């Protein structure tokens, strides 16, 4: 399965057809490294469109570390400082992390 990032991250914008592919590191675990600005907002999608596979911050916009499925999520919001960060998502555990590199 492929997993993508969409939003104002790595210059791709909210056009899902331009979504950025995450790297699979193990079963259900994906990561991507990028510089993140102070107003970063993104979602995780399972196809290059806004379809049924859509994950974001659980229940609404924020940065809780927990993902929610389509219909029960908002944008993941992160305040970066222009440094490089690793975004890791574990779809099986329903969690994500954003760590400075």
Where are these regions (language model features)?
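Insoluble glucan recognition modules
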Residues: 1-101
């Amino acid at each position: 399965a492929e997993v993508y990032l969409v939003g104002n991250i790595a210059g791709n914008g909210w056009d899902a057809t331009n979504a950025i592919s995450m790297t699979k590191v193990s079963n259900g675990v994906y990561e991507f490294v990028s510089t993140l600005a102070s107003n970063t907002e993104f979602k995780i999608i399972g196809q290059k469109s806004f379809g049924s596979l859509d994950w974001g911050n659980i229940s609404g916009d924020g940065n809780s570390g927990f993902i929610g499925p389509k219909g029960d999520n908002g944008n993941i919001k992160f305040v970066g400082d222009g440094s490089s960060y690793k975004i890791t998502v574990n779809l099986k555990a329903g969690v994500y992390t954003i760590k400075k590199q």
